[in-house]
């Protein structure tokens, strides 16, 4: 098998003009995480499944992009759904000193979480001090909750993911649990995805055989590296069975005409500007009223300054755009 891990960031994908590599892949693993983190002030989910209209980083966009659902719609324009894998994080990101939001969510903070809320941070300077990021294995966060009744799990029923909030310290951490794994399985089934990928395995949790009650030692908590989420994910995928095969693209055109159709454009995040050039090689006049149709993935909204008319028709994962010239 040939697979590739690919970005889910709209900022990166906006500059990608050639996806021809995809035809060689058996599976495409979408890294649908790190949508939000301590690199900016927006306190939002690390890996939301669906868009949330209250996401402060994307609220001004015509179409919210920082979620798995947008990444799926983008890559569905590249290859069949059964070749797409959903990325699932077994780690957290988070902030401290959070202001506003609902239990922190949609709040603001310029301070990534540190200390006990950041045991997987990077030691960038090699001095033993971890760069604040709120990065932790999931099992560590469960241990923190065992020792702190004010550290609580909340559920965002729009994005279909949980998060953790400590109201006294104003700390927010993204999270994953059995409920979000079930939501991801529902999404995989609904979209006919090929499965999932995980980053990173030692973030999953299980009961610790070396548990010492009351201990605050990282290795003596109630939970440690385990397989709780991975087992649930595996059982859910097995129960789901094989994917359906997507239908082949069909050409519904009438009699072909000897013309060239070239689409060129440029990208200025989050907008694309395209020019359509049609060159007539028939030696005869093409009379007014001709049409050009194409499928546009639902990761984008079509707007046009086209001099003729156009229509937009729902076509599953795509919108079929039909341009009609003037007389």
Regions found by a protein language model. Name each.
Residues 39, 45-48, 54-55, 88-187, ...:
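Glycan-binding loop/region signatures in secreted carbohydrate-active enzymes
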Residues 294-308:
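Short aromatic-acidic-glycine turn motif
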Residues 304-327:
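Intrinsically disordered, low-complexity Pro/Gly/Ser/Thr-rich segments with frequent PxxP/GP/PP motifs
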Residues 28, 86, 188, 196, ...:
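Conserved, mostly hydrophobic/aromatic
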Residues 1-130:
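Substrate-binding surface in catalytic domains of secreted glycosidases
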Residues 235-260:
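Low-complexity, Pro/Thr/Ser/Gly/Ala-rich linker/spacer regions in secreted
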Residues 260-285:
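Short beta-strand elements of extracellular/lumenal beta-sandwich folds
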Residues 281-298:
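Surface-exposed beta-strand/loop patches in extracellular or lumenal glycoproteins
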């Amino acid at each position: 098998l040939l697979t590739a891990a690919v970005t889910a960031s709209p900022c990166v994908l906006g500059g990608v003009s050639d996806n021809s590599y995809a035809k060689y892949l058996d599976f495409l693993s979408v890294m649908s995480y790190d949508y939000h983190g301590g690199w900016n002030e927006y306190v939002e989910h690390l890996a939301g499944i669906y868009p949330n209209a209250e996401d402060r980083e994307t609220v001004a966009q015509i179409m919210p992009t920082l979620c798995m659902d947008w990444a799926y719609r983008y890559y569905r324009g590249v290859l069949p759904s059964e070749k797409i894998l959903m990325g699932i994080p077994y780690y957290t990101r988070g902030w401290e000193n959070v202001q506003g939001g609902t239990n922190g969510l949609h709040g603001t903070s310029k301070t990534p979480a540190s200390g006990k809320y950041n045991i997987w941070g990077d030691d960038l300077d090699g001095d033993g001090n971890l760069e604040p990021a709120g990065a932790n294995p999931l099992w560590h966060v469960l241990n923190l909750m065992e020792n702190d009744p004010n550290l609580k799990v909340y559920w965002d029923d729009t994005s279909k993911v949980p998060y953790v909030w400590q109201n006294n310290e104003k700390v927010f951490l993204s999270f994953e649990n059995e409920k979000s794994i079930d939501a991801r399985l529902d999404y995989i089934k609904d979209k006919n995805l090929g499965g999932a990928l995980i980053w990173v395995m030692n973030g999953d949790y299980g009961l610790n055989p070396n548990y010492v009650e009351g201990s605050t030692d990282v290795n003596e908590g109630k939970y440690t590296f385990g397989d709780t989420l991975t087992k649930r994910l595996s059982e859910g995928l097995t129960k789901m069975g094989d994917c359906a095969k997507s239908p082949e693209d069909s050409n519904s055109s009438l009699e072909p005409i000897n013309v060239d159709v070239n689409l060129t454009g440029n990208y200025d995040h989050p907008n694309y500007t395209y020019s359509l050039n049609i060159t007539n090689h028939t030696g005869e006049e093409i009379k007014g009223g001709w049409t050009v149709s194409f499928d546009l993935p639902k990761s984008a909204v079509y707007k046009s300054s086209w001099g003729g008319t156009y229509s937009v028709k729902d076509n599953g994962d795509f919108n079929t755009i039909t341009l009609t010239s003037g007389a």
